[in-house]
Amino acid sequence: LECHNQQSIQTPTTTGCSGGETNCYKKRWRDHRGYRTERGCGCPSVKNGIEINCCTTDRCNN
């Protein structure tokens, strides 16, 4: 599986996920600088107030 891994509004980059990982994620939250976005492999659990979208196809988390 190949997932995007750039932060916020950086130029898109991707990474190959290891260990048979089958999910990509896109996590979004707001702090004092505005909205922040994190992307990567897996589907982590998040705290209240953090939006997360998980998906299962190559580069689906942009």
Curated annotation (Swiss-Prot):
**Residue stretches of biased makeup (Polar residues):** 1-16
Q: Which cysteines are joined by disulfide bonds?
A: C3-C24, C17-C41, C43-C54, C55-C60
Q: Which GO terms describe its molecular function?
A: acetylcholine receptor inhibitor activity; ion channel regulator activity; toxin activity
Compartments where found: Secreted
Q: Which UniProt keywords apply?
A: Acetylcholine receptor inhibiting toxin, Disulfide bond, Ion channel impairing toxin, Neurotoxin, Postsynaptic neurotoxin, Secreted, Toxin
Where expressed (tissues)? Expressed by the venom gland.
Q: Which residues form a coiled coil?
A: none
Q: Where is this region: Disordered?
A: 1-20
A GO cellular component term found in this entry reads:
extracellular region
In which family does this protein belong, per the annotation?
Belongs to the three-finger toxin family. Short-chain subfamily. Type I alpha-neurotoxin sub-subfamily.
Q: What does this gene product do?
A: Binds to muscle nicotinic acetylcholine receptor (nAChR) and inhibit acetylcholine from binding to the receptor, thereby impairing neuromuscular transmission.
> Which protein are we looking at?
Short neurotoxin 1
Show the taxonomic lineage: Eukaryota, Metazoa, Chordata, Craniata, Vertebrata
